[in-house]
């Protein structure tokens, strides 16, 4: 009985780590006329070490875990710092990347991609334009 429970717990943890918190639906981009800064994130296709999710933190607070081709938006009210890393136990040792920006009342667009080397792997974040963001989806 203990063996069945252990297998069940293992399978649940593995399957739940594969599901991202982002959306596959393309976000509607609105012009920022109320002075609020909106961050738009999308993750490109490409798997990393068996489907590791990209954990996005803004100012040290986790806002999403994105799977491939998922999107998320986030509002900020001050200057911000974005950190991208691997999520969960399988994400330990995965390379991290950061970006920073100003609360200037404009929309900011970011594309998260996978970077792999001979002995390394990780996520990379690049700021882009609105048209570049739309083309990446």
What are these regions (language model features)?
Residues 1-20:
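Sec-dependent bacterial lipoprotein signal peptides
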Residues 18-137:
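Short loop/turn and low-complexity linker motifs enriched in small/turn-promoting residues
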